């Protein structure tokens, strides 16, 4: 499992974005970051790359593979990269609302709690395809934390995923449009970082 060694709140404040969705993550940043340091173009590109890696919890080796795949795609490389990341199984589990963070979603997948089209899949990086149905194993649906998350989390109700409360599942209806992905990042700068 990908692990980030820097404390989560500290990393969020350093990158200037709440990558973990915790309400207290940016508290100190808002009160202390009144004067911004001038950042070079290289520094800006690096921050955008680190922001995207940290948000999706992907380490450098795998992230660079995603970038290479995106650069081979016919559509804009930045858009393609975001779509690849957004379709990771751990992220889809998070978007559906089974978990309150991508980190928690990754643990659920790794521990075999998640089904894709009715079959257990324990690979967080698995690329969910359009039409795939992702569900929670039936024996875990009574777990209070998972059921509360699924029924109550509306932070990431996204139009490209259809939730089915009766079946504890979500279906990837289509690939997302860039403006629908709930993270503010300069994806073009990320591609440019790897193009140099």
Swiss-Prot record:
CDD domains registered for this protein in UniProt: S4 (cd00165)
Source taxon at top rank: Bacteria
Subunit structure: Part of the 30S ribosomal subunit. Contacts protein S5. The interaction surface between S4 and S5 is involved in control of translational fidelity.
Assigned protein family: Belongs to the universal ribosomal protein uS4 family.
Organism: Clostridium acetobutylicum (strain ATCC 824 / DSM 792 / JCM 1419 / IAM 19013 / LMG 5710 / NBRC 13948 / NRRL B-527 / VKM B-1787 / 2291 / W)
Record's keyword terms, sorted: Ribonucleoprotein, Ribosomal protein, RNA-binding, rRNA-binding
GO biological process: ribosomal small subunit biogenesis; translation
Lineage of the organism: Bacteria, Bacillati, Bacillota, Clostridia, Eubacteriales
Designated name of the protein: Small ribosomal subunit protein uS4C
Segments forming domain S4 RNA-binding: 87-149
GO molecular function: rRNA binding; structural constituent of ribosome
A GO cellular-component term linked to this record: small ribosomal subunit
Keyword match Ribonucleoprotein: yes
Cited function: One of the primary rRNA binding proteins, it binds directly to 16S rRNA where it nucleates assembly of the body of the 30S subunit.
PANTHER family the UniProt entry points to: 30S 40S RIBOSOMAL PROTEIN, SMALL RIBOSOMAL SUBUNIT PROTEIN US4M
């Amino acid at each position: 499992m990908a692990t980030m060694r820097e404390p989560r709140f500290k990393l969020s404040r350093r990158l200037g974005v709440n990558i973990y969705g915790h309400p207290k993550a940016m508290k100190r940043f808002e009160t202390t970051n009144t004067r911004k340091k001038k950042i070079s173009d290289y520094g800006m590109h690096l921050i955008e790359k680190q922001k995207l890696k940290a948000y999706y919890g992907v380490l450098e080796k795998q992230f660079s593979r995603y970038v290479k795949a995106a650069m081979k795609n016919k559509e804009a490389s930045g858009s393609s990269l975001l779509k690849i990341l957004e379709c990771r199984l751990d992220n889809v589990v998070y978007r559906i609302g089974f978990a309150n963070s991508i980190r928690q979603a990754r643990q659920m997948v790794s521990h075999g709690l998640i089904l894709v089209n009715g079959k257990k899949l324990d690979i967080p990086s698995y690329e969910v395809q359009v039409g795939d149905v992702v569900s929670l194993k039936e024996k875990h649906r009574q777990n209070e934390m998972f059921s509360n998350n699924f029924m109550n989390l509306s932070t990431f109700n996204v139009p490209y995923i259809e939730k089915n409360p009766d079946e504890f599942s979500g279906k990837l209806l289509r690939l997302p449009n860039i403006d629908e992905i709930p993270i503010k990042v300069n994806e073009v700068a990320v591609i440019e970082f790897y193009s140099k």
